[in-house]
């Protein structure tokens, strides 16, 4: 969690930062898709915020929210370039780091209404950093274009152009639909049980014909393929093989929110083995995408199941 000094009720500088921390975390995470990099960015936001208030001649900040969001967005943009360089040498498919409810990153209060789905976060990876910033601020958090222009130090016209390009790009790759939450959770649970239990009949029932499996092991965790696997028969075969390869002692399956999605968490010997999220077809009756994160570096914040 972002380091801040011990909290005192009279410390208005700390209070004002903490009062906006959830918003800052959610904005930066949706821009980066990395919990670790988000925490690093928020640490630098706090350092800049506190350093400003240590100056004896500092002018008061009238709009702390706007001021902090601007710092946070600029920190995220700086880290975006570094992350892109890391991803160039990443082993296999890169997926966003799972942000789960009740994890160890102090993100329990992240504004879930604005948490983007795993599928949308994957699409946002194809935008330019500025397009992604504009899309996140406007579409997820409702910032007006003039306000975004001030945050990014761009003209309102330039921001509107970025917004149009980003929206067109996203909607071409991910048609806008949001499955009913209870249905999404039920399908996720049925799929997880079938996948780990080797239930071929249920897998074939749940998977859409053109389903795609995305697995992120980062060269460190189990990954069935370094590339996406396409097609119902191929994806079902993968999970049948996974079920046969599970440890004899079995695994512990739990369900938690993963950013904006219901998710399945797989534990072995008390340690996280995988986080799985499924995306449904627009009709909501089949699975169009399966996202599985097994890279242990991306699972460090996930708490083990209670005994």
Regions found by a protein language model. Give the residues of each.
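A short acidic/small-residue loop/turn micro-motif
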Residues: 55, 270, 294-297
């Amino acid at each position: 969690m972002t380091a801040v000094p011990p909290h005192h009720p009279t410390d208005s500088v700390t209070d004002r930062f903490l009062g906006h921390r959830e918003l800052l975390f959610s904005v930066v995470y949706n821009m980066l898709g990395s919990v670790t990099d988000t925490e690093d960015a928020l640490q630098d936001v706090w350092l800049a915020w506190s350093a400003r208030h240590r100056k004896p001649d500092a002018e008061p900040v009238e709009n702390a929210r706007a001021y902090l969001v601007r710092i946070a967005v600029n920190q995220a943009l700086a880290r975006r370039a570094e992350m892109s360089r890391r991803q160039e040498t990443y082993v296999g498919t890169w997926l966003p780091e799972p942000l789960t409810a009740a994890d160890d990153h102090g993100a329990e209060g992240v504004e879930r209404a604005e948490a983007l789905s795993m599928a949308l976060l994957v699409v946002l990876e194809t935008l330019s950093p500025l397009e992604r910033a504009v899309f996140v601020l406007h579409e997820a958090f409702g910032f007006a274009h003039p306000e975004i222009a001030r945050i990014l130090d761009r003209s309102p016209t330039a921001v509107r152009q970025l917004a149009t390009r980003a929206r067109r790009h996203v909607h071409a790759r991910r048609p806008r639909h949001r499955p009913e939450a209870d249905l999404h959770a039920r399908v996720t649970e049925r799929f997880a049980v079938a996948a780990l239990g080797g239930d071929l009949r249920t897998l074939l029932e749940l998977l859409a014909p053109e389903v795609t499996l995305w697995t992120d092991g980062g060269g460190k965790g189990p990954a069935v393929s370094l590339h996406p696997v396409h097609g119902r028969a191929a994806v079902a075969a993968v999970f049948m093989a996974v079920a046969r390869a599970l440890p004899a002692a079995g695994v512990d399956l739990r369900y938690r929110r993963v950013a904006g999605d219901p998710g399945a968490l797989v534990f072995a010997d008390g340690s996280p083995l995988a986080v799985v999220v499924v995306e449904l077809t627009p009709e909501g009756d089949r699975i169009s995408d399966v996202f599985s994160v097994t890279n242990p570096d991306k699972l460090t914040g996930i708490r083990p199941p209670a005994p």
